[in-house]
Amino acid sequence: MILRLLLALNFFPSIQVTENKILVKQLPRLVVYNNEVNLSCKYTHNFFSKEFRASLYKGVDSAVEVCVVNGNYSHQPQFYSSTGFDCDGKLGNETVTFYLRNLFVNQTDIYFCKIEVMYPPPYIDNEKSNGTIIHVKEKHLCPAQLSPESSKPFWALVVVGGILGFYSLLATVALGACWMKTKRSRILQSDYMNMTPRRPGPTRRHYQPYAPARDFAAYRS
């Protein structure tokens, strides 16, 4: 009898510890190729007619709150982020799914789900799970292959552009030839003008110094 009582006393605390904690399961790893990912958190607790809070944290120490939802199952609550993440979500039967969009490569990290029962008392939350490593791959843009139907307008534009380019080249050559011909005629005309005889200009005359004529008759008288 005493042995049964001791076993019962040892059994009840273990039940209480289990009931005060929510077990959460997550996938160990997710690879993101298109900057979007859906992370599901499965829990073992009945949230019917209870106020709860489900949140997603980033980092080994869960320092960044990525996305959160508050409410109950009587209405569909809204998911939101106070740290700049583009997030949404959905509540299911024993599952909370977080939709993360527009993720960047530098947001590759480990993410933890946290489930809390806020009301009625007592407050219950989950044991910290192993988390999910979200690996965001760099997005490479591949050139789209043109279908035969969509390539027809492209080749039509190429043909029209080629014809216009050919006529533009002909016009440029013709204008260049006219310009060279005009320039050559101007050069020949200039050379002809330089070869015509010109009237010599006035020459400078050298005058002898003036000396008055002597009157020899005056000396004779």
UniProtKB/Swiss-Prot annotation:
Disulfide bonds join 41-113, 67-87. The chain crosses the membrane at residues 154-174. Phosphorylated by LCK. Dephosphorylated by PTPN11. The keyword Repeat does not apply. It is a single-pass type I membrane protein. Residues 175-221 are cytoplasmic. Residues 1-20 form the signal peptide. Residues 29-138 form the Ig-like V-type domain. Homodimer; disulfide-linked. Interacts with DUSP14. Binds to CD80/B7-1 and CD86/B7-2/B70. Interacts with GRB2. Interacts with PIK3R1. Interacts with PRKCQ. This is T-cell-specific surface glycoprotein CD28.
